[in-house]
Design a protein with these regions (language model features):
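Short, flexible helix-loop junctions that flank or precede catalytic/ligand sites
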Residues: 1-376
Length: 376
């Protein structure tokens, strides 16, 4: 067994982490037979040409683990924890075994929360962030930026209201500072034993806003609805690719006999579903968010109550004046403004045919491009 305090391995790792922060990377990967690598703008970039050996990967892992963590890793082949670099950042660490060898993934947890205006978020979200009660769910796949957008909304609320905001996360993604609000951040496994205990005790802590890091099951969804029903603003994230898919996933959390009541509760308490994807900027200048917004309204509430999820998208298209926007409408705007290429717009569309037709018929940018634009 390697010495858990091996200085050489730790110093080398810290240098890679600082390099990743310098170039605004999101993740660092340590795995056997591949050089250390970081992910920047969704793409893997190698930090050296020399592949890491299995022994080196284990040495790096043990250099940052406590004795208790080494014991846990040795018995389960898994360990989750966090480390900090002085004057740099915190990192969430997942240590695992793959093909019999140690591997690690480091996720940067930053205290520098992007301002609302820098994220290309629809202005209606500022209004949503200041609502008194209800349920706001951010939707997206892994790496879609939903946690960053949600953190930005919490920060906006922090600056523009005088509340107690409680976040329950696994792990904490962004470090919030107290501004006009008191921010209480609780990490599962560190500040509280588990999700059920944390959620059960939340209302005893006099919150105004409750952030649930991720809704993964029926019990957590029940708590989210309960928080909204009792007069709190509950914000959460959910893994899904669109608002329609998110609604379907929530419905499928529950057995058939509970679904009618669930749909009624959602129709009464939902404020918004916000779904986003990160699209490469044209010219390789990073990525930009395409954001879909579903707001509750009498018509939307009626569709949800009836379980007519398939009709919601069409109603969103007709409700842009309220602040609603579909993914394809967001992609059209990004293309028209010169933020993304035609190819990336079509590739990410929910309906490539409809978006292609919309660009052909309405887009001034496409008309100006003339025959140079290949309308595939």
């Amino acid at each position: 067994m390697f010495d858990e305090n091996t200085p050489g391995a730790k110093e080398e790792l810290f240098a890679w982490l600082r390099h990743m922060n310098k170039y605004k990377g999101s993740d660092l990967f340590i795995t056997t037979n591949f050089p250390p690598a970081m992910k920047v703008d969704g793409k893997i970039t190698r930090l050296s040409d020399e592949p890491l050996s299995a022994e080196k990967c284990m040495e790096i892992a043990f250099s940052i683990m406590s004795s208790k963590q080494i014991e846990e890793f040795s018995s389960t082949n898994e360990c989750n924890f966090a480390i900090s670099l002085p004057d740099t950042s915190r990192f969430r660490v997942n240590a695992m075994v793959q093909r019999g060898a140690t591997a690690l993934v480091f996720r940067s947890i930053t205290g520098n929360i992007p301002k609302f205006e820098t994220l290309n978020l629809p202005p209606i979200l500022k209004d949503i962030a200041l609502r008194k009660r209800g349920l706001v769910i951010f939707v997206g796949g892994t790496g879609s930026g939903k946690s960053t957008s949600l953190a930005s909304l919490i920060d906006y609320r922090n600056e523009n209201s005088f509340d107690h905001i409680i976040t329950i996360e696994d792990p904490i993604e962004f470090i919030h500072q107290h501004k006009n609000c008191i921010i209480t951040q609780r990490e599962i496994g560190v500040d509280t034993e588990n999700w059920p205990i944390a959620l059960k005790n939340t209302l005893r802590q006099a919150p105004d806003v409750i952030l649930i890091g991720e809704i993964r099951d029926r019990e957590t969804m029940d708590y989210a609805i309960s928080f909204a029903e009792t007069g709190h603003l509950c914000m959460a994230t959910l893994h899904a690719n669109s608002t329609n898919q998110a609604l379907d996933r929530i419905i499928n959390f529950f057995p058939e006999e509970r679904r009618n009541q669930l749909l009624t509760d959602l129709s009464l308490n939902l404020q918004a579903f916000i779904s986003q994807r990160l699209i490469p900027r044209e010219g390789g200048r990073g990525r930009v968010a395409a954001v879909e917004v579903l707001l509750n309204s009498p018509i939307i509430a009626d569709l949800i109550r009836k379980g007519e999820v398939h009709n919601i998208k069409e109603m969103m298209k007709k409700s842009t004046g309220m602040g609603m926007i579909t993914f394809d409408q967001a992609l059209y705007d990004l293309y028209e403004n010169g933020d993304i290429s035609y190819q990336d717009a079509i590739k990410n569309a929910d309906s490539a045919h409809d978006l292609r037709l919309d660009i052909q018929l309405r887009s001034r940018r496409a008309q100006n491009a003339g025959p140079d634009l290949e309308l595939i």
